[in-house]
Amino acid sequence: MKKALIVFGGWEGHEPKLCTEIFAPLLRERGYDVTLSDTLDIYLNQEFLQGLNLIVPLWTMGTITKEQEKGLLTAVAGGVGLAGWHGGMADAFRNNTEYQWMVGGQWVAHPGNIIDYEVNIIDHEDPITAGLSDFKMHSEQYYMHVDPSNQVLATTTFSGEHAHWVNGVVMPVVWKRMWDKGRVFYSSLGHVARDFDVPEAKEIQIRGMMWASR
């Protein structure tokens, strides 16, 4: 049986427990033995981590020790998949640049806060986005600093209404990448649990998890 770990905590505004309750059952339905952890100390147990197929980080605006960070980075570099979303993965540890390098991006702004915007699928061949069309979100439109080595699957375009100087900027929303031997998947969607009521947002996330899992 494949094994997945969901590590949830940090800022409660991103509803980590509610989001865990969405995706843990979806992983179990796909044959995963899912472990839930509400402590970053789980990253200190390298023997346990190396037995995993997938890690789902769901921890916003936290503080991670160098030892905990090294444990996570080492596990993913060794081949354990990493797949997450929104601030739970890309606004997790603002002082840890190597972690951000692994993720492939870091949140910096969401102009206008909760707004209507469109997500545009740009790769219709990749299994994560195949068969999906552009769709609308009513949530935070993440403005991010991103790694040019990411394989971008979906984007969004900023209107400039809430920050005129970024009018027309095309920003990655969904990407995948490698961290040594480990597959890394990220989606900036999912500010709160109800964002996954949008079928495409949920489908992209679960497909991304399946792709990342070794």
Residue ranges, per PLM feature:
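Extracellular ligand-binding/catalytic regions of CAZymes and related secreted enzymes
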Residues: M1-K3, E29-R30, E47, H162-M171, ...
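Helical hinge/lid and interdomain linker segments adjacent to catalytic or ligand-binding clefts
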Residues: K3-I6, E15-A90
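Residue-level signal for short, function-critical loop segments
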Residues: F8-W11, G190
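Extracytoplasmic/secreted proteins, especially bacterial periplasmic and envelope-associated proteins
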Residues: L18, I22, G71, P127, ...
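Catalytic beta-strand/loop cores that center a nucleophilic Ser/Cys/Thr
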Residues: L27-R28, T35, Q50-G51, N113-K181
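A glycine-rich, often tryptophan-bearing local segment used as a flexible ligand/cofactor-contacting loop or short
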Residues: G62-G131
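Structural detector of well-ordered beta-strand residues that form the stable sheet scaffold
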Residues: G81-A83, L153, F185
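Oxidoreductase and adenylate-handling cofactor-binding alpha/beta cores
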Residues: Y99-Q106, F135-Q151, G190, A201-R214
